[in-house]
Each structure stands twice: as structure tokens, then as C-alpha cells.
Amino acid sequence: MAKKVEKVVKLQIPAGKANPAPPVGPALGQAGVNIMGFCKEFNARTQEDAGLIIPVEISVYEDRSFTFITKTPPAPVLLKKAAGVEKGSGEPNKTKVATVTKDQVREIANQKMQDLNAADEEAAMRIIEGTARSMGITVQ
């Protein structure tokens, strides 16, 4: 018989840098999870993505055991990395902060494809282009 999921905790944590301090500690402590066990496992699984923020979905079971799924980094994080900027524009329609190429957008779309609600690569690219526009990043 399958274990019953008691709680699902969603967090965004920098890759390889999970520690018991907030926000990880309080969120998992309330669910009764072994915080250090999660931190060690998460850091081991995400060490090659250092510097990126990784969304994680932690399923906590009745017996206080847990499993977690790491997702792809958020599109804005990948776009900022590709464009080489710290943050998006405060006024995206007036002030453009950077430019990315169609090839960079295609690469990001392919990386995010499993998490996007898109039927094909073109639809995924349009989603990423829309995110870029809302950040003040021009797509060429």
C-alpha cells in the first residue's frame, strides 16, 4: 500500500546552498521533516546548477518521511543569466536593459519544456519571449 501524503511544501532554494536557516528550516520543521537530511540530499542533487535558484516540491508522508522533485530554474533567472544582467527593467516598456538572441531563447525553452504548459518548441519560445518582454529584455 502506498504511503499517504500529508503535506506538500514548495520552496525556491539556491542550488547547493540549502541550510536549516529560514526559509528552509521553518517550512520543513512545521511539516516534521528531518531538515538536515533534506538539506544534504538537495545540495548533492543540485550541486552542478550552482548559482541558480531551483524550485523544489517536497512531499511529506504520514510517517514523516519525504520525497522531493526539483524543477527547472524559473525563466526570469535563466533569461537574466543569458543576458548577463542583475535584474530586469523597472519600466519594461520604456527602458530596455539587455538583448538575447532567438538561439538563447530556444535553448531556455528546451531546458524549461518539461515545466511549461506548451505543446511544442515554438509555443515554449513564445512563452519565454513574453517573459523577456515583461523584464525589459529585447529578443532578436
Curated annotation (Swiss-Prot):
Domain of life, per lineage: Bacteria
PTM summary: One or more lysine residues are methylated.
Gene Ontology, cellular component aspect: cytosolic large ribosomal subunit
SMART domains: RL11
Cystine pairs: none
Pfam family, one: Ribosomal_L11
InterPro entries (UniProt xref): Ribosomal_uL11 (IPR000911), Ribosomal_uL11_bac-typ (IPR006519), Ribosomal_uL11_C (IPR020783), Ribosomal_uL11_C_sf (IPR036769), Ribosomal_uL11_N (IPR020784), Ribosomal_uL11_N_sf (IPR036796)
NCBIfam families referenced in this protein's UniProt entry, alphabetically: L11_bact
PANTHER family to which the protein is assigned, alphabetical: 60S RIBOSOMAL PROTEIN L12, LARGE RIBOSOMAL SUBUNIT PROTEIN UL11M
The protein's assembly and partners: Part of the ribosomal stalk of the 50S ribosomal subunit. Interacts with L10 and the large rRNA to form the base of the stalk. L10 forms an elongated spine to which L12 dimers bind in a sequential fashion forming a multimeric L10(L12)X complex.
Protein name (Swiss-Prot/TrEMBL): Large ribosomal subunit protein uL11
Source organism per UniProt: Staphylococcus saprophyticus subsp. saprophyticus (strain ATCC 15305 / DSM 20229 / NCIMB 8711 / NCTC 7292 / S-41)
Lineage: Bacteria, Bacillati, Bacillota, Bacilli, Bacillales
Gene behind the chain: rplK
